[in-house]
């Protein structure tokens, strides 16, 4: 795995070094005969301290960091658009301290209408990509307002979200207001399976062979409330087997509301308020957390939600708060409650230093604890428009 990571790093450095314009933030790299490629780098490093870590079970859902320094990720993205026909492509590589992986690598057919007028309102994606389930799962961690993902997402979608191998079709009917339907099918490909909340907990869906699939339907709409504010509403689903060698299934149902406000043409002040809920209807599941973790229990329904409000009140300062709860209902598992608050100093739109505090309440026999994060996140370069999901209103 380290050799694989070294090879990816060498390839990335060679690509960047191949052009004298590599440092430019507004230009892609010019590669002879092959047109333009947009390149960006994103570094995410933090220091974390937990209260009395000897008494904390670090298998708890929601803790992707360890005590001390963490190289959360160092991302390299290569994106572009072909001139011959309407196709965009993207590859997002993630480097950690001891391994490297492909976060996304896909082809995006954004103008199918040029192939046939019947397909004018359709788009398609094939490859490894982030599933359209809610808003949060679609963005990369450098766009997170806080250092860690919400508990409900970690529980059902994994600590870094779902981004498996498959295909997706979206349809935007030619009506007003805007509405979009999407349907994606994903399998594990060469990966171990569906992302689990922790290394020792069973995943929401069991993906053992290439024939095991998870289907993700979604519908969403977007409304311009005023010249400075907009509102997005979405409903998502996921269907798949929940145990190996079984036909028992889990159905995920999600809803999300995203409100954004920005004052005029400047990047500040602005508000981003995101609320999402996920519920799992499970047929005889293997329990993920609590006293019965790892055991098969009777059918149940378990769900959770979070609400996160970020406010950039000046050119350099932003404050964020999040409240989250898993246990509505709790089914066969323990309830979970966490409150987080963060303050960030923005050196630029792509470089920031943050301090975050979180309180994780008692969950079953796991005692409550506190955590403090110091995060440094910096980016360089540019991404081809249309190949990534961005929630910031600037």
Task: Briefly describe each language-model feature range.
Residues 228-329, 392-393:
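Detector for outer-membrane/organellar transmembrane beta-barrel domains
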Residues 25-192, 212-216, 220-228, 311-313, ...:
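Outer membrane beta-barrel
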Residues 67-74, 100-103, 161-165, 211-215, ...:
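Residues that define the transmembrane beta-barrel architecture of outer-membrane proteins
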Residues 310-361:
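C-terminal hydrophobic structural anchor segments
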Residues 41-49, 91-95, 126-128, 181-187, ...:
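Transmembrane beta-barrel strands of outer-membrane/channel proteins
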Residues 46-50, 96-98, 114, 131-133, ...:
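Sequence/structural signature of outer-membrane beta-barrel proteins
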Residues 51-57, 98-106, 138-141, 193-201, ...:
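Outer-membrane beta-barrel translocator domains and adjoining extracellular loop/strand segments
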Residues 255-257, 345, 368-394:
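Outer-membrane beta-barrel "beta-signal"
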């Amino acid at each position: 795995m380290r050799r694989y990571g070294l090879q990816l790093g060498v390839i990335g450095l060679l690509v960047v070094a191949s052009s004298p314009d590599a440092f430019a933030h507004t230009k892609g790299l010019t590669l002879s005969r092959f047109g333009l490629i947009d390149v960006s780098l994103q570094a995410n490093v933090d220091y974390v301290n937990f209260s009395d870590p000897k008494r904390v079970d670090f298998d708890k859902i929601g803790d992707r960091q360890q005590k001390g320094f963490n190289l959360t990720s160092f991302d390299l993205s290569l994106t572009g658009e072909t001139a011959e026909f309407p196709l965009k492509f993207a590859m997002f590589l993630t480097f950690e301290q001891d391994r490297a992986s492909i976060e996304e690598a896909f082809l995006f057919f954004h103008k199918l209408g040029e192939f046939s007028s019947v397909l004018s309102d359709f788009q398609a994606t094939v490859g490894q990509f982030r599933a359209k389930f809610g808003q949060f799962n679609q963005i990369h961690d450098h766009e997170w307002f806080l250092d860690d993902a919400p508990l409900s997402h970690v529980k059902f979608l994994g600590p870094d979200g779902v981004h498996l191998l498959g295909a997706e079709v979206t349809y935007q009917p030619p009506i007003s207001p805007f509405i979009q339907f999407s349907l994606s099918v994903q399998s594990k490909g060469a990966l171990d399976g569906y992302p689990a909340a922790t290394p020792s907990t069973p995943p929401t869906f069991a993906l053992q062979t290439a024939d095991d699939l998870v289907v993700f339907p979604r519908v969403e709409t977007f409304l311009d409330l005023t010249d400075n504010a907009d509102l997005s509403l979405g409903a998502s689903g996921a269907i798949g087997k929940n145990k190996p060698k079984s036909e028992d299934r889990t159905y995920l149902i999600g809803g999300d509301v995203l409100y954004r406000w920005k004052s005029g043409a400047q990047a500040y002040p602005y508000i981003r308020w995101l609320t999402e809920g996920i519920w799992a209807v499970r047929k005889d599941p293997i329990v993920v957390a609590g006293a019965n973790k790892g055991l098969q229990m009777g059918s149940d329904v378990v769900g959770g939600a979070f609400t996160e409000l970020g406010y950039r009140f000046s050119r350099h300062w932003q404050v964020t708060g999040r409240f989250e709860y898993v246990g509505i209902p709790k089914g066969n598992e323990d309830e979970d409650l966490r409150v987080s608050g963060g303050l960030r100093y923005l050196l630029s739109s792509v470089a920031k230093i943050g301090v975050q505090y979180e309180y994780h309440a008692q969950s079953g026999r796991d005692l409550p604890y506190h955590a403090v994060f110091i995060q440094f996140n910096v980016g360089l370069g540019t991404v081809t428009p249309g190949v990534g999901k961005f929630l910031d209103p600037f």
